[in-house]
Amino acid sequence: MRRTINLAVIAALIITGASAEVMVSATTVESHTDGKSIGLNLWGENKHYTDDLTVNVSGLGVNGNKYHNNVTGIYALDGSQVAIDKNVNVTVVNPAPAESGEKRRPDLAHYYMSGIYAGYGGVTNDGNNDDTRITVQGNAKVDAIGVGLQANKDGYIRILGGADVKTHPLTTSDTYSALSEEGFVYVNTGMDGLKPGAKDVNMYGNIGFINKNYGIDTNPHNHGSEISLGLTTPKSKLVGGVLNEFDESNNNPHHGGLRLYLQNGATWRNEWLGAEREYPTQGRPDTANYLYTGSKVEHLIGGATEGSRGIIQAVDARPITINNYAGHTAIDYEKGAPAAENGKGEVVINHADPGSSVTLRSSVDALKAHANAEIPGLAENQFVKKIVYNGYTKGERNLGVNVHLETGVISPTLNAKLSPDDFDTDGRAVVSNKTVLSTSESEIVSGAKSALASSVMQMRADTNDLQRRLGDVRLNSDNQGVWGKYIGGKSKITDSAYVNQNYNMAQIGYDTKRGNWIIGGAFLYGTNNSDYALGSGSGKTAGLAIYGAKQFNDGRYLDIIAKGNHLKNDFTVHNSLGTSLSGDYRNTGASLSLEYGKRIKRNNGFYIDPSAELILSRLSGESFDARTNTGSTVHINSDAVNSAIGRLGIGIGKEAKNSNVFLKAALAHEFSGKMKSTYSMAGEPTTNSVVDLKDTWLDLELGGSWSFRPNTYLYGTFTKNVGSTVDTSYRVDAGIRHNF
């Protein structure tokens, strides 16, 4: 047996009555045995860790004739108070986990294997103690055989940051990522379990609520058993079923159970992991009432809007029961999931808050025989029956139900929006003559269309006027010049496509004076990264430009620039049900821009700068094949995109001998800019998509130039637009020019 505790610093020892609080900085606790093994074993003790805490434990739950050795990371009882100011990392290795409890019953095995355990608080046979509390201000990472976070009688485990809790399904007993037996587990939901945070939370393992109403040390049932999980980020996920013995036995007077915040793309994959529950054998009047018959959730709080909803992946054939529901949630039924079978995978909602909704998503292929897409409304009606709204039978009309049913990879999606009265007398959802039926493009087509729009956005990002490209050419005092600049920004499309693009480009150029003209050329190279509604992509662009800028003696100026660009993009998009499409394509772009304006000087260096600009461009079409993760091929043909943008601007500025600052507003209009694409594949009808960029918007530009040496000046602009389909959240141009 080896057990060591490495303490970096003991900062203070505070004695208060019969108890002591020990403040400790960064700590690593190790306990490695061939039997019982506990890292931190705390009975009525106070510990305060001011830095990270790491606990590594290994042992054997079963060894010889010992079949319930306790192998646990942190074991706090009898009113212990544990405060961890930063993060906690617990690893429990147990190759032979306990198979039962002291009475040789598998339903007791969980008491003897935990990552973090808090319990036996309040009044016990050891006396009258305080509640047992473990509070982690930072994040918790737990990898344990058995139970990740276990709070028994009057025990509190509060993880105020994020969490990564991983358990390992066993065949000998049921295990849980979080378990409550008249205790409290709060993860990313504040001190009271009611304030969801914004940290990533990943829980791999079932959730359990145990009704200890038998044997020794029965719980007094003074309050409910509670677990509150804040899954509020796209990277957050719960995998596991939810056992609630109080609901299973129809005896839940305190309404204890799981409070699940499922928002912003977070996922709950509902499937029971590991061994099924076995019949309890001691002191219960009807043992069958304590078996797992489906996940039961006390409160499920979805997104505030449909755009911020979370996702339930329905896998287990047994029903999900939600006692109290609020917000918006998508429920996915994937191909091959038992829940997708006819009559399986029901979601029962007993009460819904006003304005809440659920959206069922699946495919005709996943639903198989009971989904006939040829008859309007039939497949939707069979699918929507998976929703049972018991509140409807009691007079509620609060739950909205939507259906999205994929009919293929590129084939249109079937949609249904039920009316508030589209439920039968038993509360089961039905399609009626009040239901709104429609079709829309598939999520794969929508994603591919967005990926194609990335090239158009790349072309837009490379447009510039004279000030953005060269700064204040008035400061150009010599015959020749070289310059370089950085272009970076963020733009997005949310109308008819969804693209969120970040780009970074570098441009270098050389020019020379020819009378009143500055004639030159430039090379550009840039990269971008794009996020789509369901997917992502990246791109590169390289281009050459020739330009001429003429300065008139009366302040007028004319700027002409012609450019050619080569663009390359790759992408992967997917739908909600796991089908993905990957491809790459190349385009060639050409553009011609003409800008004419006049700087009208006023007193004290102030000036007004009216201008007009016309930008003509063409992005070549492309025909290519993209492949799905199932091996099929989608042929995509994208037409060429012609664009004609006109801009009328007015600027005001102030110039000095060696500097210039200005503010400019320009009304812009896209006269063309329509992007058409066609998608085809074996076994499905050809479909089309259109992104129409014809639009009017306002460009706002702030910039200036500063000559810090006789032949060298810096220049830069900050640009943003308002009301555009291609929304420029920001663009920064920053350059340096040297004349000689």
Residue ranges: model-predicted function:
Residues 206, 241, 481-485, 518-522, ...:
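Residue-level detector of the transmembrane beta-barrel scaffold of outer-membrane proteins
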Residues 199-201, 236, 478-482, 504, ...:
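Outer-envelope beta-barrel architecture signal
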Residues 200-204, 208-386:
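Extracellular beta-strand/loop-rich repeat segments of large surface/secreted proteins
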Residues 439-604, 718-719, 724, 735-737:
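Outer membrane beta-barrel translocator domains of Type V secretion systems
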Residues 21-22, 327-345, 359-511, 587:
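Outer-membrane translocation/initiation segment of Type V secreted surface proteins
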Residues 496-502, 533-535, 568-586, 620-642, ...:
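Solvent-exposed, glycine/polar-rich loop segments of beta-barrel outer-membrane systems
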Residues 545-550, 602, 635-740:
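Outer membrane beta-barrel transmembrane domains
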Residues 28-43, 56-79, 95-124, 130-133, ...:
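Extracellular beta-strand/beta-solenoid scaffold signature
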